[in-house]
Regions:
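Extended, low-polarity segments enriched in aliphatic/aromatic residues
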Residues: 1-156
Length: 156
């Protein structure tokens, strides 16, 4: 199971989870036993929904008003940042994005890649779409974590 892109939602769920928590998320709550991880991987969408569920747990615990999200869109590779030998970056750096809404933030970053004039985006878009990566954003919106609607405000 791979999340497709490492935005705010992926990092809030997988990034801060313990080993048992990461296993629970990757298996869509089938097991917390890391030894059983690769024998119990769920359908891709179930994994992506599990990431959204984990995000909701974090937000419910910390409080929506206490969290600011920042995505650094640089060194954009087709591989997960957890890969010890990731593929080289495919695109030029896009920039920094910030929001109090993780759903809007990840949607904006996804759109920035898709709409980029950079020819290196092709491999990233193919990877994100082949893994249905936007589904985490859809699932998080359905859980009430935010809205996919956003407005970009450039600071310079």
């Amino acid at each position: 199971a791979i999340g497709s892109f490492g935005g705010a939602l992926k990092n809030m769920s997988i990034g801060i989870a313990s080993t048992r928590g990461k296993t629970n998320i990757h298996t869509a709550a089938v097991t917390t036993d890391h030894e059983k991880l690769f024998s119990t991987l769920p359908q891709q969408d179930h994994f992506l929904e599990s990431m959204a569920d984990a995000c909701k747990a974090v937000v419910d615990y910390k409080g929506k008003e206490n969290i600011l999200y920042i995505n650094v869109a640089n060194n954009l590779s087709i591989d997960c940042d957890c890969d010890s030998h990731p593929h080289a970056p495919e695109m030029a750096d896009i920039g920094l994005f910030a929001s109090a809404d993780p759903v809007a933030l990840d949607q904006a970053c996804y759109d920035a890649v898709v709409n980029s004039p950079d020819p290196g985006k092709a491999a990233l878009v193919q990877r994100m779409d082949s893994l249905h990566g936007i589904h985490t954003v859809e699932a998080a919106e359905a859980l009430g974590l935010g809205s996919r609607r956003y407005e970009i405000v450039s600071l310079g």
